[in-house]
Amino acid sequence: MSSGYSSLEEDEDFFFTARTSFFRRAPPGKSRSGQPDVEKEKETHNYLSKEEIKEKVHKYNSAVTDKLKMTLNSNGIYTGFIKVQMELCKPAQPSPEPSSGGCMNTLHISSTNTVGEVIEALLRKFLVTESPTKFALYKRCHREDQVYACKLSDREHPLYLRLVAGPRTDTLSFVLREHEIGEWEAFSLPELQNFLRILDKEEDEQLQSLKRRYTAYRQKLEEALGEVWKPG
């Protein structure tokens, strides 16, 4: 669908859930005083006790207005929805599916899902075949009429950030973007060389696909011309 929305009433084939990977949890520490700052970049998950999670999930669900509530399991893992704005420059390759550029996608994930897994899930859903390393997930925060965008680490957990910030997207929202040119400077030379190999492979695949299409088209055209000029 062009909106990228996955409804609970839709057929299972169209309801997309990111693959869940379970990580060894760090022992829960004491809760931080005050509201956590959603603008501060974190490398790892800020783990809460089961009681703190239960309280926050209840508070979150009480504030939900679109029925996209979170569900808390007995093991302390919770599931819920995040909305991601797809701000891609162009489709990675021709596809009969609607373009993902500029649409809003609702994704059902677990509290154990990382940013890296969310990126991979979104790219799979929109049939984007380019490497996930070419994309980044940003959190967009709104504070006092100011908008702040911060790129998230691959090890962060988007659903935790959503839980802490609450359900309002005008307070916190997520955006998927392609890496800007200047951001490639952060990668090592072997990584950049690997990206080039991936691009070369994608370019070759596109070229071979184009050649096959035009070869088939030429063959059909020649067959049609042969039928026209065949003696009666």
Curated annotation (Swiss-Prot):
Gene Ontology BP terms: signal transduction
GO molecular function, one term: identical protein binding
InterPro entries for the chain: RA_dom, RASSF1-6, SARAH_dom, Ubiquitin-like_domsf
UniProt keyword terms in alphabetical order: Acetylation, Cytoplasm, Cytoskeleton, Microtubule
Chain residue ranges for the region called Disordered: 25-46
Residues in SARAH domain copies: 181-228
Subcellular locations according to the entry: Cytoplasm; Cytoplasm, Cytoskeleton
Domain (Ras-associating) ranges: 78-180
The protein's name in its UniProt record: Ras association domain-containing protein 3
